[in-house]
Amino acid sequence: FCNLSYPKNRNSLLQQESLDPMANPNMYISRGAERAVSSNKVLKNTYMLLSATLAFSALMAGVSIAVALPSWMYLVSVIVAMVMGIFVLPRTANSSAGIGVIFAITGLLGLGLGSILTMYLALPKGPEIIATAFGGTGLIFLGLSGYALTSKRDFSFLGGFVFAGMMVVVIAMLANIFLAMPALSLAISGAIILLMSAFILFDTSRIINGGETNYIMATYGLYLSIFN
């Protein structure tokens, strides 16, 4: 009689076939579509929260200017915001409490920024300087984000470069405290602009390609790039 029983390794063969993209193209298309929908949702939530935090920062900066907070408040607010961003936000980013934390961080940074803007407003061409800085920052962010969104390129390779660059900038800033060289200050400012531009490309690319799935942490990264 013929042996009509199934081979013992039939289940393993079926599993291999199920993982074969040629045998099950619809499964891979479905997974790709799910990833795209998830990335688009994170991207939408990120930009909505980013817009809200920027508006809140602007409001707090206005309050800071109105009450004329001293310039040393900038350092205090940045230190407190950094501590919250490093130790508090990662622990709350997966809950609704994370939204409150991100608003607290951006509000503090807005207060500190307002104390610096107060000094610039006292200069002869202070308002023009501030308008140019804000306008340039907005154009750079929109341009780089638009490029990352339309090109859909993977800019994850910039991660190591940005980290190394930030270490160099921090060392240069510490050295310039003692050297007080105007040329070095200008070079540091230019380097920070380039590094923050790379950060915008890196963070936006991670959201698009599914590398960042938490919109609160994504908002925090993009906000810091704009703030700096």
Spell out what each predicted region is.
Residues 2-228:
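A hydrophobic alpha-helical transmembrane-helix feature that marks the membrane cores
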